[in-house]
Amino acid sequence: RGLGDVYKRQDVSNIASAFATYSDKFNVKKICVGRDCRLSSERIFNALTDKLIDYGLSIFDVGIVTTPVLYFSLFTMDVDGGIMITASHNPPDYNGFKASIGKNVLSSNQIQELKILIRKKDYIIPTEKGSIEKIYMIDNDIDDLNKRISISKKIRVGIDCANTPIGLFVNKVFKKLGCESYILFEEPDGNFPNHHPDPSIESNLSSLKDLVLEKKLDIG
């Protein structure tokens, strides 16, 4: 991870080239790529996928999603890996990559191997063009959750989306589970105008606490 503006197009191209080279050893041909709503994510996504296509990879664009939705796609689609463009709970000017081969996230040692490839520019030579296709995974993920989780009584729940991608579908999740939901900061916004999306900082929970108390909710 690093500052999003630090990832110039050539830097992202080098990361894509290193991933394509390293994953070629594992016969990776098809991958899912997702991104969060940070201001730099779309630009990084375009640079990354353009280069991966140059290396012959078939890309399934799962859109603006949470990291768990990207991981869900690895287990439910016929793909060989995936990349999530995100900086998780870091400030809005940060961004980064979470890469997987098969169903496993790259280890720290594997990431160091990518770093060596980038330093040496020791990339495979592309032989054919790949492709890109948009895929909508969120409804499949919600249906899977609904099959796995059952709630015996109606729960009144408050959710603070912190202007992150979860706001795109969280209401659907709880509605299908039969919950009564009250949602804060639902609209994805890479500026995170209401608060930093880090729930480990107690001050970021103040609006949610107020909501739970005001509405007398069961949980938040």
Question: Could you tell me what each predicted segment is?
Answer:
Residues G2-Y7:
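Short, small-residue-biased leader/transition segments that mark boundaries at the very start
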Residues N14-T21, A47, K51:
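Residue-level detector of alpha-helical secondary structure
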Residues A16-I31, R148-S152:
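Glycine-rich phosphate/diphosphate-binding loops that line cofactor/substrate pockets in enzymes
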Residues V28-Y94, V173-G220:
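N-terminal small/polar loop signature for handling phosphorylated ligands or for N-terminal nucleophile
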Residues V12-S13, G63, I138, I201:
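A conditional alpha-helix N-cap/helix-loop micro-motif detector
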Residues D11-A18, V69, D141-D144, N204-S207:
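Well-ordered alpha-helical segments embedded in enzymatic catalytic cores
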Residues V12, A16, S41, F45, ...:
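Short, highly selective alpha-helical patches that border small-molecule cofactor pockets
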Residues N95-L217:
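Gly/Ser/Thr-enriched, mixed-charge loops and adjacent short helices
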